[in-house]
Amino acid sequence: MKSLHVAANAGDLAEDCGILGGDADDTVLMDGIDEVGREIWLDDHGGDNNHVHGHQDDDLIVHHDPSIFYGDLPTLPDFPCMSSSSSSSTSPAPVNAIVSSASSSSAASSSTSSAASWAILRSDGEDPTPNQNQYASGNCDDSSGALQSTASMEIPLDSSQGFGCGEGGGDCIDMMETFGYMDLLDSNEFFDTSAIFSQDDDTQNPNLMDQTLERQEDQVVVPMMENNSGGDMQMMNSSLEQDDDLAAVFLEWLKNNKETVSAEDLRKVKIKKATIESAARRLGGGKEAMKQLLKLILEWVQTNHLQRRRTTTTTTNLSYQQSFQQDPFQNPNPNNNNLIPPSDQTCFSPSTWVPPPPQQQAFVSDPGFGYMPAPNYPPQPEFLPLLESPPSWPPPPQSGPMPHQQFPMPPTSQYNQFGDPTGFNGYNMNPYQYPYVPAGQMRDQRLLRLCSSATKEARKKRMARQRRFLSHHHRHNNNNNNNNNNQQNQTQIGETCAAVAPQLNPVATTATGGTWMYWPNVPAVPPQLPPVMETQLPTMDRAGSASAMPRQQVVPDRRQGWKPEKNLRFLLQKVLKQSDVGNLGRIVLPKKEAETHLPELEARDGISLAMEDIGTSRVWNMRYRFWPNNKSRMYLLENTGDFVKTNGLQEGDFIVIYSDVKCGKYLIRGVKVRQPSGQKPEAPPSSAATKRQNKSQRNINNNSPSANVVVASPTSQTVK
């Protein structure tokens, strides 16, 4: 084996720098295969001519002896600066120069082993400062003559090198140098970050993320060169036993975020080296601290930058249109599909405008008067957002008398302001809250509704009008039409309106037109029926008809001194029967209304409800329960005896139950039916009174054979 000769004046420098301290037993690669026995001489610039060789092939590039890889040498801060030997003006590159490596292409291990580190010895011809003595100066930190290792990123930066933050910054390094300092890149086999983004470089949008790691693309895999040393291979196998957790964590993060991270965006985040050192010390130091710090940095980047950029990109791509405020007839655009964010404070929702069907000139209605027949057309989509929540009480059928009314409904005129001769048209029974109106009025009224519906106060007022079923929308529009119909409707209203409307409409009204409902002067005595009709009534039905007669005359609420509050919601009402006001102390409630508005009952025993009496302001503890009844239920309100006695309720009177929309409590009110003036309640007819009445009727109707036949039947039944 040949030995390595070094000039005397450069020997100390080589020994100090650890460059030429190799083992003589190892093989030295020469520039020529046939000149194996030549001695290797390094050029000495100190001036000793005996050691200067004038031939070009005496310059040696690198030697792979493990002993020359000294770990204390400074490192280059940037990977592009590490390159293989190149030719210079003074000493060209030798022919067939071979650079050896101490690693394999499939290994990734720690850099703590000096024998497994990468090193490149640059020739003296690459010195960026000409005419400088490399081997005689004694400065081992000169990057032109030192072995550089990429495994350690601890570098003494000075302003002349131009590395760091900007041009010449000294204390700020980029993120790749940061991860190198954290021993993230200390393996012999660097992973190629550009391979992760190889498919996304051309199509990735750089605006998809905010800030990621800087200069990841510059970390190109250093070409692995063929290793001819068996000893170095054994050292590599021993280093494979240590798993690099930091590299695995970082690589996993890159793979998970490769959809949103492009190679061009990995240049933006910079962290000072002093910050990394301080954070590592606070976390306890060592490799575990570096691993924890790496996870924190990656989590911070992903949470505060990647998601923020995604949110910004998403919001910029969405275009919002202002709320639909203009008249639909001025902008009949059938493709109004812009996204409008939903809002609870507005009564408008995104919908596609559809031209309305032809106007129905023969139909004018009101939100409160929904019991009038409506055309079987689907509601216009532009009106649907204006609708309030549907009424909680179920609508009755559109034909026939209402369930709680005992009077048939005569036909109504086309523009009748009363809608129903009984004075009640239902609680918004019309599913279309804003129905069809004449074309001349539709635009003005729609604009009025659009403006009023946009405020909360308007919604409150509209709900109050629905509860009272009296609205002022069409008062001025229908006055002229209603004046012609008032005279012919007064007789019908006098019979039924006063009896039913106040029961279902607990509203204080005045006779001077405080509301536009007409209250006629009700006669003290009901109209006399023909004698034949009187005699046709069976004796057993007289008691029921007599109890029904006072029901036609009810004291209005204004005479009882009670005014409804705006926050009360009508739930149900019940006309009291004999069993409800008897000694049982319970009132049977309507099944449908009870199931709809009162709390749901799971057990048969029911629940206790605190009912506040509106008239006396007293709270009654009543029990709400049900009885099973042939696969159905009968709902009861028990403990009502004291309430009935206090309010003096009798058969034919009724109760009304409300709920307070603000506090959720229940309120009950007993309404007495006014007895006709000069008329006393009838006592149950006795058998003697029945005989006398039948005898008098027989004397009156002696000249009527048909009447005698009619009267004979109930008389014979009574005797039997």
UniProtKB/Swiss-Prot annotation:
SUPFAM superfamilies: DNA-binding pseudobarrel domain (SSF101936). Isoform 2 accumulates only at the end of seed maturation. GO terms for molecular function: DNA binding; DNA-binding transcription factor activity; sequence-specific DNA binding. Induction: Repressed by silencing mediated by polycomb group (PcG) protein complex containing EMF1 and EMF2. Residues 122-146, 324-360, 675-720 are annotated as: Disordered. Residues 572-674 bind DNA. Residues 129-146, 687-700 have a biased composition (Polar residues). InterPro entries: B3_DNA-bd (IPR003340), DNA-bd_pseudobarrel_sf (IPR015300), LEC2-like (IPR044800). Its main location: nucleus. It comes from the Eukaryota. Interacts (via C-terminus) with SPK1, SCAR3, ABI5, APRR1, AIP2, AIP3 and AIP4. Binds to BZIP10 and BZIP25 and forms complexes made of ABI3, BZIP53 and BZIP25 or BZIP10. The truncated abi3-6 mutant lacking the DNA-binding domain is unable to localize to the nucleus and is an embryo stay-green mutant. This is B3 domain-containing transcription factor ABI3. The lineage of its organism: Eukaryota, Viridiplantae, Streptophyta, Embryophyta, Tracheophyta. The gene is ABI3.
